[in-house]
């Protein structure tokens, strides 16, 4: 597993404890109570390091190569999954994985953005950067879900929509805008979960829903920290400052009413205990579905409209009183 800078001290401590345990099998250098004392120190070290992460360190956790991706969530949560491909206009976009899923006996249309796990798969998936056909594919499956009365689950994990000339020529901006328009009026419950990177319009095109959730170390932003640093300071190395200024993580976005729920991750990030994350995400999806399924279509659409209508409202103080 690739090590992040803040993880090195923890890993060295873990190796030391493992070596003591191995040697103890032969020579009993340390008593079990002494080893337990070392393990408690390790727990305190982890708590200290991971409770005081900078926004940029959390971005690094979010981008960790071993972090669970959409296909991992499908394998970890679904009893059944039948993949559906193509946009019926141009081609299939491998950056989107979607299909009919069964989670704890309940059927969903599950649609996720997929980056890939190694060099060849990342190139095949275009590093999770959707082309117009990817957004059309997601919308096609969403409309199919509406037709058959299935709730929709979107898993968001993208560094952004593909900015290439070919994508622009095929109507990238229109494809994203059309998704926003169509998903806002779709007559079925929509649950959105940001599992990794949620960057710019690439994320937004699959993030219109009745409830928006994020994993603890995922981020949701109009731009990447590097892109922001390049624009503001003409220096992509100022990514740490940009990450702090963007307020891109769940606790800040929840205060702004952009996201509704922040799901905690295992200590160190989702890649340290994927099965626990799959369980928590599955429980969240089922819990929200039980809440949303009792709403009438009229109430569902009105609440969805009001949710996005009120994002961005703020109050200022004046001599005559607060103004919106």
UniProtKB/Swiss-Prot annotation:
Pfam families xrefs: ACCA
EC class (word): transferase
Domain CoA carboxyltransferase C-terminal: 37-291
SUPFAM superfamilies (alphabetical): ClpP/crotonase (SSF52096)
A GO term, aspect molecular function: acetyl-CoA carboxylase activity
EC number per UniProt: 2.1.3.15
Disulfide bonds: none
Keywords from the UniProt entry: ATP-binding, Cytoplasm, Fatty acid biosynthesis, Fatty acid metabolism, Lipid biosynthesis, Lipid metabolism, Nucleotide-binding, Transferase
GO biological process, alphabetically ordered: fatty acid biosynthetic process; malonyl-CoA biosynthetic process
Protein's pathway: Lipid metabolism; malonyl-CoA biosynthesis; malonyl-CoA from acetyl-CoA: step 1/1
Top-level division of the source organism's lineage: Bacteria
Compartments reported by the entry: Cytoplasm
Subunit record text: Acetyl-CoA carboxylase is a heterohexamer composed of biotin carboxyl carrier protein (AccB), biotin carboxylase (AccC) and two subunits each of ACCase subunit alpha (AccA) and ACCase subunit beta (AccD).
Job of this protein: Component of the acetyl coenzyme A carboxylase (ACC) complex. First, biotin carboxylase catalyzes the carboxylation of biotin on its carrier protein (BCCP) and then the CO(2) group is transferred by the carboxyltransferase to acetyl-CoA to form malonyl-CoA.
Family: Belongs to the AccA family.
Alphabetical list of NCBIfam families matching this protein: accA, AccA_sub, PRK05724.1
Protein name (Swiss-Prot/TrEMBL): Acetyl-coenzyme A carboxylase carboxyl transferase subunit alpha
Lineage: Bacteria, Pseudomonadati, Chlamydiota, Chlamydiia, Chlamydiales
Gene: accA
């Amino acid at each position: 597993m690739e090590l992040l800078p803040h993880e090195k001290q923890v890993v060295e401590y873990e190796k030391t404890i493992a070596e003591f345990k191995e040697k103890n099998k032969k020579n009993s250098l340390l008593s079990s109570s002494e080893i337990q004392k070392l393990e408690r120190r390790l727990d305190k070290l982890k708590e200290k390091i991971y409770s005081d992460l900078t926004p940029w360190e959390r971005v690094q956790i979010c981008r960790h190569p071993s972090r669970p991706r959409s296909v991992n969530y499908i394998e970890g949560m679904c009893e059944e999954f039948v993949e559906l491909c193509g946009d019926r206009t141009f081609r299939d976009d491998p950056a989107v994985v979607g299909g009919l899923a069964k989670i704890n006996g309940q059927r969903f249309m599950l649609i996720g953005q997929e980056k890939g796990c190694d060099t060849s798969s990342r190139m095949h998936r275009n590093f999770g950067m959707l082309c117009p056909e990817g957004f059309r594919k997601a919308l096609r499956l969403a409309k199919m879900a509406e037709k058959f009365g299935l709730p929709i689950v979107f898993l968001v994990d993208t560094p952004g929509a593909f900015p290439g000339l070919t994508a622009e020529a095929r109507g990238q901006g229109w494809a994203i805008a059309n998704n926003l328009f169509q998903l806002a009026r779709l007559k079925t419950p929509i649950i959105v979960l940001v599992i990794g990177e949620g960057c710019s319009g690439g994320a937004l095109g699959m993030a219109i829903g009745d409830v928006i959730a994020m994993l603890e170390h995922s981020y949701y932003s109009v731009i990447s920290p590097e892109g922001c640093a390049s624009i503001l300071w003409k220096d992509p190395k100022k990514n740490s400052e940009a990450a702090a200024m963007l307020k891109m993580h769940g606790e800040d976005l929840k205060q702004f009413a952009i996201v509704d729920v922040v799901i905690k991750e295992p200590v160190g990030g989702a890649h340290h205990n994927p099965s626990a994350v799959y369980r928590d995400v599955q429980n969240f999806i089922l819990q929200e579905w039980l809440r949303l399924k009792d709403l009438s279509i009229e109430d569902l659409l009105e609440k969805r409209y009001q949710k996005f209508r009120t994002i961005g409202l703020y109050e200022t103080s004046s001599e005559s009183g607060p103004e919106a």
